[in-house]
A protein has these predicted regions:
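A detector for short, charged/polar N-terminal pre-domain segments
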Residues: 3-9
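A structural motif detector for beta-strand N-caps
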Residues: 10, 14-18, 22, 28, ...
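Short, intrinsically disordered, charge-balanced linker/junction segments flanking boundaries
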Residues: 65-69
Length: 69
């Protein structure tokens, strides 16, 4: 699922695969041919998370950033 967080919205190329129970939150960019697997959480509430072309985030992964990273 994709979730906005205040003024931060996920950006999706539309040419990728996201598991139905994955959470893409806030300032997250997904490039084409990327995949986000089951129970993964990508939380872009502080800084951007950029998932490049052809990348995959495996089952149960949690991605979050600190300020300035």
């Amino acid at each position: 699922m994709f979730y906005d967080l205040k003024d931060k919205k996920p950006k999706n190329s539309g040419e990728n695969w996201v598991a139905p129970n994955a959470a893409i939150i806030g300032d997250v960019t997904l490039q084409k041919n990327s995949s986000i697997w089951f129970n993964a959480v990508l939380r872009g509430d502080i800084e951007n998370i950029y998932i490049g072309e052809g990348s995959n985030i495996q089952d149960g992964s949690v991605l979050h950033t600190d300020p300035g990273c």
